[in-house]
């Protein structure tokens, strides 16, 4: 098995390369907050030598409640993304939920994300593929790791092979997710880059009646475990005031802890990727 390399400017995304951070905030709450969070991430990742892609959503279309905050919308969100890209010279990732969003979003961001709940929607997959952008596929909570090959095939047959696979936990009864570490290794066998969304894997879906709960206190333990697999990247969201974040605050890393958190993740990644592979199947 050879590891596919996704080239994003000077950044190489692959399972055997130094990990890439996909990080930022869950949803765009305001222009000023987005700029502040992007600046912190940019400074910390540059200091630590970690390749970095800024992440935020312009619309959270799958909130538990119709009254929950969704975001500024595509038009305003893309303006904020353009300013972040220009100011900090950062590549960008965001998610799309509808076919008509794909082309305009791909004109601004570098990676477009297929949400886990929509990963089997063929029309959306085809529209995303046709943009030619790099695609980050969130593994649905209800699919087995080996079933990701069907989504890969859809993208391939629609003309796009620039695919990243993202683990975000699997349903485990009601209102709970668990992370199958062997499942991530199974996805790596495809050769495509695999990243670990350690933020959303902490969710307790529907755990707060009208919104998702989370287990922020275990953010470090879960991410350490994932990084020990030797992955292409880590996906995390942070917030300066998680308890008052407009979406997924219970899962968000406190922004002031970002540097120490990433120091540990980089140390694990460097160590694991310095090892010689051991084939225990023989």
Swiss-Prot record:
Alphabetic keyword roster: Cytoplasm, Lipopolysaccharide biosynthesis, Transferase
- State the EC number(s): 2.5.1.55
> Which GO cellular component terms are attached?
cytoplasm
Q: Where found in the cell?
A: Cytoplasm
What the entry lists under InterPro entries is as follows: Aldolase_TIM, DAHP1/KDSA, KDO8P_synthase
Q: Which Pfam families match?
A: DAHP_synth_1
GO MF annotations in UniProt = 3-deoxy-8-phosphooctulonate synthase activity
The pathway this protein participates in, as annotated, is: Carbohydrate biosynthesis; 3-deoxy-D-manno-octulosonate biosynthesis; 3-deoxy-D-manno-octulosonate from D-ribulose 5-phosphate: step 2/3; Bacterial outer membrane biogenesis; lipopolysaccharide biosynthesis
The record's Gene Ontology biological-process terms are: keto-3-deoxy-D-manno-octulosonic acid biosynthetic process
Presence of the UniProt keyword Disulfide bond in the record: no
The keyword Coiled coil is annotated on this UniProt entry: no
Query: Which reactions fall under this protein's catalytic activity?
Result: D-arabinose 5-phosphate + phosphoenolpyruvate + H2O = 3-deoxy-alpha-D-manno-2-octulosonate-8-phosphate + phosphate
Name the SUPFAM superfamilies on file: Aldolase (SSF51569)
Location, primary (coarse class)? cytoplasm
Q: Which NCBIfam families match?
A: KDO8P_synth, PRK05198.1, PRK12457.1
HAMAP family noted in UniProt: KDO8P_synth (MF_00056)
Q: Which family does it belong to?
A: Belongs to the KdsA family.
Q: What is this protein called?
A: 2-dehydro-3-deoxyphosphooctonate aldolase
Instruction: Give the originating organism.
Output: Shewanella baltica (strain OS155 / ATCC BAA-1091)
């Amino acid at each position: 098995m050879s590891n596919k390399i996704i080239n994003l400017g000077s950044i190489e995304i692959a399972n055997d390369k130094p990990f890439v951070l996909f990080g930022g905030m869950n949803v765009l709450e305001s222009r000023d907050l987005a700029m502040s969070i992007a600046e912190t991430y940019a400074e910390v990742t540059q200091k630590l030598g970690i390749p970095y892609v800024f992440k935020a959503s312009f619309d959270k279309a799958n909130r538990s409640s119709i009254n929950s905050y969704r975001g500024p919308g595509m038009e305003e969100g893309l303006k904020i993304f353009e300013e972040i890209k220009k100011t900090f010279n950062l590549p960008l990732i965001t998610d799309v939920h509808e076919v008509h969003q794909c082309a305009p979003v791909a004109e601004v961001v570098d990676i477009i994300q297929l949400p886990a709940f929509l990963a089997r929607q063929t029309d959306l997959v085809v529209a995303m593929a046709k943009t030619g952008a790099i695609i980050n596929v969130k593994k649905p909570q209800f699919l087995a790791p080996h079933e990701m090959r069907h989504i890969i095939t859809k993208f391939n047959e629609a003309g796009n092979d620039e695919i990243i696979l993202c683990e975000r936990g699997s349903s485990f009864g009601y209102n709970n997710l668990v992370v199958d570490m062997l499942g991530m290794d199974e996805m790596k066998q495809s050769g495509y880059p695999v990243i670990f969304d350690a933020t959303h894997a902490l969710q307790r879906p529907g755990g707060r009646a009208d919104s998702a709960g989370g287990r922020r206190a275990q953010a470090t333990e879960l991410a350490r475990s994932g990084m020990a697999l030797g992955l292409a990247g880590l996906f995390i969201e942070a917030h300066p005031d998680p308890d008052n974040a407009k979406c997924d605050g219970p899962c968000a890393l406190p922004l002031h802890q970002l540097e120490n958190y990433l120091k540990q993740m980089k140390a694990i990644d460097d160590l694991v990727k310095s090892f010689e592979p051991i084939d225990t199947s023989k």
